[in-house]
């Protein structure tokens, strides 16, 4: 999604939601009802590497393929804009080993993702190993479009899904795991 926009892409990353507060299973039928695509089931194993200029992660998929993703996103509360570059790989295991030796691992996140496409928004229903269930909204911004347009679109979608502002939490999964003292060596495959 959005790969035809050139090597550097812009996304608006919306809020994260905690299932204990909002009932993830109740959101699934609502997401299905408004989606043009999905559900698409994806297993993702993300290894984050030490990187001074942003974040770099290797995303391995269950079918043996992967993507090296470098991105920059502000460390601020609430919705944020993200700039990133993707590079596909057919050898994620070997690439993980090389990057781990060169840069060191900063964390690892393993998740089962159920993806829905609603217009230009990716709706992620995630089951994250050692963390729980979450919902994330990711709005693809067009060239020259303001982040505020992404915020407005995310808020409209939140209303359709029955999500309230009080149910939002901040932070990337790797940061939430780190806050709990769970780092790369504690990661395992989902059951």
Residue ranges and their predicted role:
Residues 1-10, 14-120, 161-191:
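N-terminal strand-loop-strand beta-hairpin
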Residues 77-83, 135-136, 146-148:
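A short, polar/proline- and glycine-enriched secondary-structure boundary/capping micro-motif
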Residues 20, 88, 127-130, 143-151:
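Short capping loops/turns at secondary-structure boundaries
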Residues 105, 110-143:
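Conserved, surface-exposed functional patches that form binding/active-site neighborhoods
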Residues 2, 27-30, 135, 152-156:
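Glyoxalase I/VOC metalloenzyme domain signal
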Residues 145-169:
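Mixed-charge, glycine-accented linear interaction segment located at domain edges/termini
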Residues 94, 111, 132, 149-156:
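Residues forming well-ordered secondary-structure scaffolds
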């Amino acid at each position: 999604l959005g790969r035809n926009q050139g090597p550097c892409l812009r996304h608006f990353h919306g809020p994260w939601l905690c299932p204990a507060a909002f009932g993830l299973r109740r959101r699934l039928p609502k997401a299905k009802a408004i989606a043009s695509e999905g559900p698409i089931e994806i297993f993702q194993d993300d290894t984050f590497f030490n990187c001074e200029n942003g974040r770099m992660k290797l995303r391995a998929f269950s079918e043996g393929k992967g993507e090296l993703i470098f991105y920059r996103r502000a460390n601020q509360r609430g919705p944020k804009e993200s700039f990133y570059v993707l590079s596909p790989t057919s050898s994620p295991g070997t690439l993980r080993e090389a990057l781990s030796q060169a840069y060191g691992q900063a964390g690892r996140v393993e998740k089962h993702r159920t993806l829905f496409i609603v217009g230009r928004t990716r709706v992620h229903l995630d089951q994250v190993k050692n963390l729980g269930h979450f919902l994330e909204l990711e709005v693809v911004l067009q060239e020259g479009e303001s982040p505020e347009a992404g915020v407005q679109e995310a808020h409209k979608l939140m209303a359709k899904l029955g999500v309230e502002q009080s149910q939002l939490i901040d932070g990337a999964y790797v940061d939430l795991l780190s806050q709990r003292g769970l780092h790369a060596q504690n990661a395992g495959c989902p059951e």
